[in-house]
Amino acid sequence: LPPLTNKPQQEVTGRTNPGNTVTINDAPAQVAQDGSFKGTVTLKEGLNTIIVEAKNAAGLSTRKLVTTTLDTTPPNIFIDDPGYLVDVTEIEVTGRVEPKSKVTVNGQPATVTHDIWKAVIKVNYGKNTVTVIAIDQAGNSNTATKDLLVYKRVIINLTIDNPVPTINGEPQAPLEAAPFISGGRTMVPIRFISEALGAEVKWEEITKGITITLGDTVIAMQVGSTTVMVNGKSYTIDAPPVIKNGRTFVPIRFISEHLGAKVDWDESTRTVTITRDFIP
């Protein structure tokens, strides 16, 4: 018998002297002419003691005790949260499992130390499914999954009176007009900033209207007007859109934040930094 199994039905085999009778847990076993015997036992969950007794024609008997453990419970699997993932192609995933289990993560063997498993996996932008399969010593298996999101980050830097912006540290083509401050608000070219954030910009020449669309967000504004509509809701901004050197400029914080970006201002360098994490 195996010392540990997940199969309740087990065959017990052995050999005794020819002519002996054998019982296994008081149930008669089949004994061949050469003394080999076999019988079937049904195990209960946990530790089982099997009593094999052989008796000769004179009535003398010999007993042997064999122990085996039945474990039919699949191993629990825990997957740790790897945290917020940005611009990564490879990550280490970790978790816990029943000690001495064999673990695979997305088909690759994981390292298991006592009850801690870990593995390095490849990831892509967007949703990634981590599939963990664990097989314990008894042969029971279990599967757990966890969806992870990997974001792409865009960082835009614009400096007041400097026409050269940067995106993720790379200088871009000079703008027709540099960012400037109006009414205490930093004004930036709407088309550049919107498209850099992944939005679509439409210009209506007759009404001087601007429509910015990003996913489910639609921002509508008009040159010279402090009223802005965001998904049909009206807002009032401090500085209206203006046209400078043939380009439309808008207050950066209002637009960026409604497009899901974070805006930071460095007074010492007069630089505005716009950061947006998104799923490509």
Model features per residue range: what roles?
Residues 1-151:
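Ser/Thr-rich low-complexity repeats and stalk/linker segments
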